[in-house]
Structure formats: C-alpha cells, structure tokens
Curated annotation (Swiss-Prot):
Belongs to the protease inhibitor I11 (ecotin) family. Residues 1-24 form the signal peptide. It comes from the Bacteria. This is Putative ecotin-like protein. Gene3D superfamilies: Ecotin. Keywords: Signal. The keyword Signal applies. It comes from Methylobacillus flagellatus (strain ATCC 51484 / DSM 6875 / VKM B-1610 / KT). SUPFAM superfamilies: Ecotin, trypsin inhibitor (SSF49772). One of its GO terms (molecular function) is serine-type endopeptidase inhibitor activity.
C-alpha cells in the first residue's frame, strides 16, 4: 500500500502535533522503579496513545548546553535497558558518558556559541509504548530530550543485478 503525498503530509503533521502531547510526570507508586543512584536523576515521559505504535520508535537524546566553537562536539554514551523485577516494566540507564569530544578545526576567534551537545552511542532508539511510562536515568547535569520516528512509506523492492 502506497500513501499519496497528501496522506503522507497529513500523517507527518499528526505525528508532529502528537509529539507535543507527551509530558513528564510522576510514576505509579505501586511500581517499584529504583531510586536514582548517586549522581543520577530519574526522568519520566508519558507518551500519547497512537494508532500504529508497533511501527513507531522513540529516540532518546541526552546532552547538555555548552559554550562551543565552530567544531562538531559530542559525548559518547550507552543506553542500557533494565527491567523492574517482578513487573517486567522496562527502564533505561544512560551510562559510560565520556567526553566531550570535538573535531579540531581552526575556528575564528569570538565564534563561541551556546549549543546543545548530544551524546551518541548504542541503545538510544527504544520501543514506543504509551501504556507504560518511559523511565530514564541520566547523570546529573545532563538533559533528556526525545523524538518519535515512524515510517512514511512502505518498503521498496531492490532489483536484482
């Protein structure tokens, strides 16, 4: 099934509007999510229900706003999925944050700006599930951001050589 351009545009706009509907919130007191370890903070995202959640992914982005020059800056990190024992609910921990690292281009003096510097690594794309909160533990001093991903068209066949 192929979507017409207008249907693709409507689906894309709907996803953009729904992204703004997710909100941070409190956890259900009955579910024993662990307390944050020393030096970590717990973040909770409540996602809106979607008609096609099995084809939607959630991309997590962890970073901090820093004064940077014209080079490309980033942190290295890994997202590890854990499970609340006895409940089977997932939660995520960002660990092994290293850096920041940057390219080494010569920058004109006075070009520093304030920018969000994100961490890159494995595990940052997770399952979209509006039935459970998305619980993410990140190091203190860092910020959690997210966005959703959804396919805009069917797979295309690659012809054989």
């Amino acid at each position: 099934m192929s979507l017409r351009p207008i249907e693709t545009a409507i689906a894309s706009l709907t996803m953009l509007m729904l992204q703004g509907c997710a909100h941070a919130g409190k956890l259900d007191e009955k579910v024993p999510y662990p307390q944050p370890a020393d030096g970590y903070q717990r973040n909770v995202i409540h996602l809106p229900m979607l008609a096609d959640e099995e084809n939607t992914k959630l991309e997590l982005q962890v970073g901090k706003t820093m004064q940077v020059d014209c080079n490309h800056h980033s942190f290295g990190a890994t997202v590890v999925e854990h499970t609340v024992k006895g409940w089977g609910y997932p939660y995520y921990e960002v660990n092994s944050i290293g850096g920041p690292i940057s390219t080494r281009m010569a920058c004109p003096s006075g070009t520093e700006t304030s920018k969000f510097v994100a961490a890159h690594g494995n595990g940052f794309v997770v399952r979209y599930n509006s039935k459970l909160p998305v619980v993410v533990y990140i190091p203190q001093g860092f910020e959690l951001r997210y966005r959703t991903w959804q396919p805009v068209q069917e797979f295309q066949t690659v012809p054989q050589d």
